[in-house]
Each structure stands twice: as structure tokens, then as C-alpha cells.
Amino acid sequence: KLSAEAKAWILYDGGNSAFATTVIAAFFPIFFNDFWASALEAEVKTAYLGWGLTISNLVLLFTSPFIGALTDVSRTTKILFTGFGAISIVSVAVLYFIPAGSWLQALIFFGIANYCFAAGNTLYDKMLVQVSNESNIARISSYGFAFGYLGGGLLFLINAAMTIKPEFFGLSSVAEAVRWSFLSVSVWWTLF
């Protein structure tokens, strides 16, 4: 039987994986180019998106050892994990409100969300040893992995359907559907 902490650990993957599928992999890069950076030259918007991701990941590269060391010597793992998750959830929700042409705002909030998502995942992985033991660590990890695919995939399918048939969902355009998809990721993630 799994502990409540192990079940919560497994469920969380179903929520935050929606960010990876809907935002990172599917909609943000395309929407950045077509909505927020549509007035820029193709090479420029591609470069800006690349730089935004690079900066976010470099900050993660340089801060992760400090986050890891801090959580090793203090009882801040859950606090930081919750904080990173909350900041990422709010940053993704903000994407809904950013108007067309505001590429810098979109890139900043995406960069914050991406950084906090990845930093939170580092702590999430670290917590596996806290919610499991030698006999069930592989099973709990596998359940989390599977539930992440299930949760992220399910919301992505709904979001993809929203962009294919926005009128079916009461939306006026594909752009509105994508914006609602960002908001749905925040809600989905919060629920898990």
C-alpha cells in the first residue's frame, strides 16, 4: 500500500507534465512566433525564442547546485518545491493575458515558468527518496512517470481539440483557444 505522500508525489506528475506537453512542446513556440512576435523577422523571433530558453536554462544550471545544497542542509525542500510550482503556475496563467505583439513580456513569463518548472522538478525528483523505500521506489517512480504521461497527454489532447475546433468550445479563434490552453495548464497543474 502506498503512503499519502507517495500518492501525492505520483499525482503531481500528472499535473506538471501538462506544462511540458502543452506549453513547452506544443503551443508556446508556435504561438510566440505567430502571435506575440508576428511583427518580427523570422530569424529575429527564432533567435529571441532561443535566447529566452538559453537564459532560463543557464540560470537553472548555475542555481541548481545552490538549491540542492540549501535543501540538503535545511528543511526547505517542500517549501521551495511548492514555491517554484506556484510561481510557474502563475507565470503560465499570465500568458493568457499578454496581448499580441508583446513578445518580450511573453518571453519573460515563459522563461520564469520554464525555470521554476525545471527547478521544481529537481526537487520533485529529490523527494522520491523521501516518499518511498528500497522495496517500492521503482514502483512509485514508474507510477509517477506513467501518470505524468497520462495527465500531460490528456490535457494536451483537450487543448489540441480546442485549437482544431475552437467554436465547439465556445471560442472565437485559434488564438483564443491557445490562450485558454495556457490557462487550462495552470488550472490543471493546481488541481494536482
Where are these regions (language model features)?
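Central cavity-lining transmembrane alpha-helices of secondary-active solute carriers
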Residues: 23-27, 46-69, 90-91, 153-156
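C-terminal ends and interior cores of transmembrane alpha-helices
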Residues: 61, 82-103
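MFS 12-TM fold signature
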Residues: 53-56, 85-92, 148, 188-192
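A membrane-interface helix-boundary motif in multi-pass transporters
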Residues: 40-48, 77, 143, 160-187
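Glycine-rich segments within core transmembrane alpha-helices of 12-TM secondary carriers
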Residues: 138-163
